[in-house]
């Protein structure tokens, strides 16, 4: 008779944005800490956890399909994440799901796992988890989530109904995690949240402590402290508050990456008002001009929506004029699509699909030309590149201007003497509208 005890196995699916990925990492870290095995297939797992996305209709569909596949292959499924906030919608399609929780419900997920799968017998002195926790990104970069939820009520968005109002993590806790990641060899931290520039607003920017020293809970103080780690620090999801101006000098001094991901969404004052978004195009253009004077190497990424309800040709032309003037480096564009629960669905003058498509094409054609011209300016220059992949044909990396997965890449054809995580100096020899090619200096 064998005395080998069965080690419970958990299958895991993570869908959606980097913020959801961080939630998955936290759940997986807890599971591994308790001694559960995490396995890549469903058929030999004791149960499956599906961390869902519910931001847009296509994401909802993908999540429902993933749940269905897990039920078919395994039968015992726990659902969490943004779509979990809509339990009725999930139960209607998949009534056999065991349990459903909303986003960032880590303790509830673990309680459900304990209920349906026996807790492993685990020697607490045997560490199954690295100090930095389980990471789903390559070893040389990691996402650092600084807050949860959002206080804004943009009419096209349902995130606050899923993830709640802003809750900032204690700054000492955030900085301790950042230090653990840096000590583990992470070369780039990607700071994420629903609204990075609002960090600390909910706690009135109270003073926290890190290494026994007082630190204000604010985006600027956070950046100043992260700069001391000596690794790349990249800011994402930065709402255009006035105090964003205060981080530009830190970028100019090389303390954090000269990169700002700032979702502007539109340029027409009328459409911005319908979206419940702040600011005017003229004021934003003036700020961009000022930022570039302070930090000439600044890379600006933004996202926009075309075909928002009520958008006229005149409104759209304002957006194109803004693009021509702003000359942003990296731009994402989405055709407006109704999201269940979003107040924008009730607005008058919905734009026909063929008009959305036509405007999206015009937008992308213009921005691709601008992006190509911006990258062409880098030909002949030397830049730093963080290596992501290496094979027999060469290496692929990213410059300071490139976030993983959403931006471009730098191709080093024939360069095989490097490894992922290396930072190398490269001379740029060629560019298109998205990527660069170069050789190591």
From Swiss-Prot:
Residue numbers binding [4Fe-4S] cluster 1: 17, 53, 82
Cofactor(s) named in the record: [4Fe-4S] cluster
GO biological process: tRNA modification
SMART domains documented for this protein: Elp3 (SM00729)
GO cellular component: cytosol
Single annotated GO MF: aspartic acid methylthiotransferase activity
Location of this chain's protein in the cell: Cytoplasm
Residues the entry annotates as binding [4Fe-4S] cluster 2: 150, 154, 157
UniProt remark on cofactor binding: Binds 2 [4Fe-4S] clusters. One cluster is coordinated with 3 cysteines and an exchangeable S-adenosyl-L-methionine.
A Pfam family hit: TRAM_2
DNA repair is among the record's keywords: no
Domain MTTase N-terminal: 8-118
Domain spans labelled Radical SAM core: 136-373
InterPro entries: Elp3/MiaA/NifB-like_rSAM (IPR006638), Methylthiotransferase (IPR005839), Methylthiotransferase_CS (IPR020612), Methylthiotransferase_N (IPR013848), Methylthiotransferase_N_sf (IPR038135), NA-bd_OB-fold (IPR012340), Ribosomal_uS12_MeSTrfase_RimO (IPR005840), rSAM (IPR007197)
EC supergroup of this enzyme: transferase
Span of domain TRAM: 376-441
Enzyme nomenclature, EC number: 2.8.4.4
Catalyzed reaction equations: L-aspartate(89)-[ribosomal protein uS12]-hydrogen + (sulfur carrier)-SH + AH2 + 2 S-adenosyl-L-methionine = 3-methylsulfanyl-L-aspartate(89)-[ribosomal protein uS12]-hydrogen + (sulfur carrier)-H + 5'-deoxyadenosine + L-methionine + A + S-adenosyl-L-homocysteine + 2 H(+)
The keyword 4Fe-4S appears for this protein: yes
Keywords recorded for this protein, A-Z: 4Fe-4S, Cytoplasm, Iron, Iron-sulfur, Metal-binding, S-adenosyl-L-methionine, Transferase
Family to which the UniProt record says this protein belongs: Belongs to the methylthiotransferase family. RimO subfamily.
Function: Catalyzes the methylthiolation of an aspartic acid residue of ribosomal protein uS12.
Protein name: Ribosomal protein uS12 methylthiotransferase RimO
Organism: Klebsiella pneumoniae subsp. pneumoniae (strain ATCC 700721 / MGH 78578)
């Amino acid at each position: 008779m064998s005395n080998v005890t069965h080690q419970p196995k958990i299958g895991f699916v993570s869908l959606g944005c980097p913020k959801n990925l961080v939630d998955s990492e936290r759940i997986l870290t807890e599971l591994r800490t308790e001694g559960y095995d995490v396995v890549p297939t469903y058929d030999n797992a004791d149960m499956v956890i599906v961390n869902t996305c519910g931001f847009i209709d296509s994401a909802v569909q993908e999540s429902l399909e993933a749940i269905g596949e897990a039920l078919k292959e395994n039968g015992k499924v726990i659902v969490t994440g943004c779509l979990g906030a809509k339990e009725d919608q999930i139960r209607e399609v998949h009534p056999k799901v065991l349990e459903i929780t909303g986003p960032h419900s880590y303790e509830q997920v673990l309680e459900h796992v304990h209920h349906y799968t026996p807790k492993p017998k685990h020697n607490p002195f045997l560490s199954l988890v690295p100090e930095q926790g389980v990471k789903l990104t390559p070893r040389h970069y990691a996402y650092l989530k600084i807050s949860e939820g959002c206080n804004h009520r943009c009419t096209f968005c349902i995130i606050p109904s899923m993830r709640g109002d802003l809750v900032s993590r204690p700054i000492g806790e955030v900085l301790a995690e950042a230090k653990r990641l840096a000590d583990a060899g992470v070369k780039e931290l990607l700071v994420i949240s629903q609204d990075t520039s609002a960090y600390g607003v909910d706690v009135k920017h109270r003073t926290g402590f890190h290494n026994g020293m007082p630190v204000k809970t604010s985006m600027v103080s956070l950046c100043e402290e992260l700069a001391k780690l000596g690794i790349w620090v990249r800011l994402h999801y930065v709402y255009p508050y006035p105090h964003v101006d205060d981080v530009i000098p830190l970028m100019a001094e090389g303390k954090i990456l000269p990169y700002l991901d700032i979702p502007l969404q539109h340029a027409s004052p009328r459409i911005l008002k319908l979206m419940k978004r702040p600011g005017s195009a003229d004021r934003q253009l003036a700020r961009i001009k000022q930022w570039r004077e302070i930090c000439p190497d600044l890379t600006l990424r933004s996202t926009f929506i075309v075909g928002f309800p009520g958008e006229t040709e005149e409104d759209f032309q304002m957006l194109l004029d803004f693009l021509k003037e702003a000359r942003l480096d990296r731009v994402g564009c989405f055709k407006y699509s109704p999201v269940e629960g979003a107040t924008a669905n009730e607005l008058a003058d919905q734009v026909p699909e063929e008009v959305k498509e036509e405007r999206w094409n015009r937008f992308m054609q213009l921005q691709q030309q601008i992006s190509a011209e911006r990258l062409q300016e880098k030909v002949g220059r030397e830049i730093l590149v963080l290596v992501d992949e290496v094979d027999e044909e060469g290496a692929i990396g990213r410059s300071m201007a490139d976030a993983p997965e959403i931006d471009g890449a730098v191709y080093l054809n024939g360069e095989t003497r490097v490894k992922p995580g290396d930072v190398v100096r490269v001379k740029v020899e060629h560019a298109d509208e998205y990527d660069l090619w170069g050789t190591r200096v």
